Amino acid sequence: MQFLAIDCRRPAIAAVAALLCAAGAWGDSGEAARSVAAGSTWTVEQTTQLRTLDIAPGASVIASGGRSLTLTVDGVETGLAAGHYAGDVRLTPTDNNIVKFGGGMPGGSELTHYFRQAVYLDAGGLVASKSALAAAGKVRLADGVVSGVRVRSVGENFNGVYVAGGHYTLASPSIYATGNGGNDFAGYGAALMSTGKGTTLIVDHAHVRTHGAIRTAVIANDGSNLIVEDSDIATFNGVLPADYVTNVTPGMMKDAPWMLGIRGNCRATNLLGNDTNATYINSSIAAEGWGVLSIDSSRNTHLTAIDSRISITGTSGYGSYAIGNSLNAFYGSTFNVADYGVIITGGNAVFGASTPATLRRLNDELKLGLSEPQLSAIKQQPTVLHSRRFGVMWHGDGSVKVGDDTVFDTGLTSFLVKGAGATISIDGTRGAQLHAGNGVIVQVIDNDDPGPVTVDGVMVNKGVYHEPTAAPEKLADFDVTQTHATDVVVTLTGITLAGDFYNAIRGGAAKGGAPAGMGSLGPGATGAPAGPGGPGAGGGPPPGMMMGGPKPASRNLVVKLVDSQLSGVIAASSAKHRKDTIGAEDYQLLGVVSNTPGAAVNNGVLVELDHSTWTVTGTSYLTSLSVGADAHVAAPAGHTLRLTVNGQLRPLAAGTYKGTVVLEVTPG
């Protein structure tokens, strides 16, 4: 048995020595009270316990040897500042935990953070010299299980549990943190964090609450494997510094980029670094704003939720963010979100049921370590996505796969694609359903993200969207009758569906996103892996911050029906926002458009029917229509359908029609 494997430095020695290290003494000279006068400096040599501490304005309290210093009052981590402190007052010097982040503009300076944490674990055990144990509760480590963690923090930039190596189970931790974090791209100030290849952290029955800007609840980083089970996690927005300027520079960004149509300043969780896995099982994860299950600065990652609740409790935010060829997979989970279920830029999302076969596959592929009784205890249920606005939004290339008995219930459009290539697969053979509140299943538009403005090397969120006024110009080298690798391709299989599909791409270059030539701030991405349970993907944009750069936006919408019945309009269109000029105050108007169907310019629409029926409910403008021998295209009862190709009336029969293809519906 390994019991409390800690020491004052390294290697581990007896538990008695560790406890002596943590206990400290009555002051450095035996006093129970200490006053630090203005202009003076008190250098703390060892863990020191007082009954009262007074720090005058202009005084300084530091740890010896350049180490970090943590103040606790009655076991609560407290910001070290001028003031009067009374009770069980402890000052704990700890060895520095230096974390560097290559944020800022390309070629910019590296950020260096000095993490402080209540509990620091590595492959050798609990490291007392890096742990502010006075803030940790009654910690016990036995046979790889860490129990007794109770962290209360009212200071800024304080981490709860930091695991950098080894295989640990964190049993029933309770963490409450109030105050802002420092950098959620690095995990600075997170309640729970795993980092490093070879690190596996199982968090079991955790209760975590944070209240502060970028005071993230959970961080998985740098190739670690994080598994969260039966836990309750929630974050709440904080108060931003008075001098903060909203921006999207990684490492400096402290609030959501409004150009995505969201607000808030604390992501509940963040997955970072290459080859990192994070899995949430039978857990509740909530954020007041911004996002719940986020990914950033990474590639080739897996973010999985099984039988979990994913919630935005405030007025704005998303359920999950897919970037850098990530695979974001949701099985038996329920979304209750304000703006988007998932946002995609370079990642892939899968929605399905928590079937026994799926669970066993995930257990192997993600190294979850679930026993047969644990697997059997997970109830099979569908994934249900409730969003007050959109289901999935793209502002970068990626794919979505919807299967089993998944239900999308959205106030607005099910799938909103902004100037990106997208692959959307909907398999209704097991009962999947899509309910769009505005009647639009797929909407393709140019990217209306106005992008930042660079001020003194910082990408400030001062961009403004302006509705184009000129008519789109036809691009001679773009074929609107053929499928391209960059198109939006929707495949409907075995589903009965009512709703419309619009392609309102204008063509040319999409405005917004990162400045030209910059892209994102990470290494180039490669194709995403094919598992677990999701499609592979082609090379995505470079990972990094949650943006994409300008790129050619001419693209077709391809809709394939296989063994399906669709009632609705499929058409090229022109789109118009509710306001011609959209700034930060109108952030929720981004992506909200009305459509006027019309002949395609750079926005081809190709429809393929295989053993399917399309009931055309309104005039539809296509560039290609392929009707299989066992397929049907018809008007609703009491209406007549007329087909013209390049202005010529044609009988509608099995075959392929290309050019300006118009299906006109009239009464009678």
What are the residue ranges of the model-derived segments?
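All-beta strand scaffolds that present successive hydrophobic residues in beta-strands
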Residues: 36-37, 42, 50, 55, ...
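Extracellular beta-helix/beta-solenoid repeat scaffolds
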Residues: 46-101, 150-210, 214-230, 235, ...
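Extracellular beta-strand/beta-solenoid scaffold signature
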Residues: 112, 117-135, 155-162, 183-194, ...
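Exposed loop/turn and edge beta-strand positions of beta-sandwich/beta-sheet ligand-binding modules
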Residues: 30, 186, 197, 274, ...
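N-terminal domain-start segments of secreted/luminal proteins
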Residues: 27-51, 98-152, 156, 180, ...
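Short terminal (N- or C-terminal) low-complexity/amphipathic segments
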Residues: 3, 520, 525-530
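Short, T/G/N/S-enriched strand-turn elements that build extracellular solenoid repeat scaffolds
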Residues: 31-36, 42-45, 49-55, 72-75, ...
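Gram-negative bacterial Sec-dependent N-terminal signal peptides
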Residues: 1-27
